[in-house]
């Protein structure tokens, strides 16, 4: 997903949040897709083993409003169709990757249509600001009522990573809350290595207090199609460092839509700010040939790798306290 974060960030603060519409009340439980005392059954069954109860995970889901024919700039959080889609897709297949690393919180928010990124001056900016202001309000409510000083993992994908990057800049970067940052997982967007003033790109698997990011593409795809990633921050979500290559046997597993885990499925190769992967080895690999890139799978493709790494970082953070 291509856009200028610097521009978006500047526009956000120049706007003075003047474009925000009616605020969402996050004291209402139904305005949360996930809280630790209200995990949907479809999500609960994805959790494997024990959970770190001294760490929280604040998760923000990716863009689901993709239909070019849909005229809406934002989704109302009471839209039953999208609520069900959120619960049964990104909550189930993405957020679950962090379920063992801490207590999960995920707000419903009025996310922006995908067109917002390419039309900042023609409605896109206001659309993204509405979405971010919801995420921001939910995060403030979370801090004031739920967190109680625990470590914090920020996790998201695509548009979710957009909003989390702004939370990092507004609430963590050089602020007191930075001491509670376990890690920020913000894949699916292009970030600079120096995107934040005091929050580093983490290049060790047990490192804490920083961020990790990546964008996944097909290995045989014409690399010119991903040229906008050139020079962007990237780590290998199999090795959790900047190693340029990881063989299939190091891949811990990706979660497919049939809820099955496929291990040792592909090689990963870092080049020009992108994680290039070989065609996954699994029973439905023919589906991969129809895809131009694997953006939609930035989390699912590395689900078990993320799960294990998030547990490791939570453990490392708690040992340092």
Regions found by a protein language model. Give the residues of each.
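Surface cap/lid and interfacial helix-loop subdomains adjacent to catalytic sites
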Residues: 131-148, 170-316, 320-321
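Loop/turn elements at helix/coil->beta-strand transitions in domains of secreted/extracellular proteins
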Residues: 53-55, 100-104, 148-151, 178-182
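Active-site catalytic motif of lipid deacylating hydrolases and related acyltransferases
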Residues: 61-149, 282-300, 304, 311-321
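Bacterial Sec-dependent N-terminal signal peptides
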Residues: 1-20
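Flexible, membrane-associating and regulatory peripheral segments of lipid-active enzymes
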Residues: 17-87, 91
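Gly/Ala-rich beta-loop-alpha elbow adjacent to hydrolase catalytic centers
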Residues: 156-160, 164
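Short, hydrophobic alpha-helix immediately C-terminal to the catalytic nucleophile
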Residues: 165-169
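Structural recognition of the beta-strand scaffold that forms the well-ordered cores
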Residues: 56-60, 105-108, 153-154, 183-186, ...
